[in-house]
Amino acid sequence: MKLIGYFRSSAAFRVRIALNLKGIAVEHASRHLRKGEHRAPDYVAINPQKLVPAFVLDDGEVLTQSMAILEYLEETHPEPPLLPNDPVGRARVRSLALIPTADIHPIQNLRVMAYLREKYEQSEEGTFAWSRHWIETGFEAYEASIAGNRHTGAYSHGDQPTMADLCLVPQVFNAARFKVDMSKFPTIQRIHTTCMKHPAFDAAQPSRQPDAEP
């Protein structure tokens, strides 16, 4: 199996964490998003969405969209689980995971930033302000959902990492890039610190990837 990603991609970061947690060894390849390598014809033939990650199975089948890949890994490699056993718990974890992946990331990723610059002549500070607004809006919802909740433990749900944490941590890394004041989100900060002490999260972070840049 092969994961095609980019060191700074939040979506690829989620999948790397899952692979590490489940002990799944795969080949890693990179497409440099800022250089437009994800739009090259050979990659578009693999993933017409022109996004990373793409997850190539041993039989040549290609999976796209990080959440679909996470669900595939959970179904094919159930241990350790990324979802709780109970229906309510699974729904809560998926709901939390969708805050970063559906409410935040799609409106502040690289292609949105590029569109704001090119179409609306936004400066870097303008695009950063846009990103900060949407990250903070999403984090306000995430923080309110986990702070004081009886299901919250060392991690977003209970005392083991779940799919929610795999989606939260990459977004916290993005928040640092866009200079978000994280002091407003103490529970998120605590959980992020806990996650980054886990070898699976630490090894998946952008700076530890072969294609990492300053």
Question: Where do the PLM segments sit?
Answer:
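Carbohydrate-binding/catalytic loop surfaces
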Residues: 162, 209-214
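Generic structural signal for helix capping and beta-alpha/helix-loop junctions
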Residues: 13, 36, 192, 212-213
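Phosphate-coordinating loops and pocket residues in cytosolic domains that bind phosphorylated ligands
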Residues: 45, 197, 206
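Juxtamembrane membrane-interface segments at transmembrane alpha-helix termini
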Residues: 200-201
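GST-like domain detector, emphasizing the conserved glutathione-binding G-site
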Residues: 1-126
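GST-like fold's C-terminal all-alpha helical module
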Residues: 100, 104-197
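Conserved beta-strand edge residues that scaffold enzyme active sites
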Residues: 33-34, 189, 209
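Active-site-flanking alpha-helical
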Residues: 74, 171-172, 205
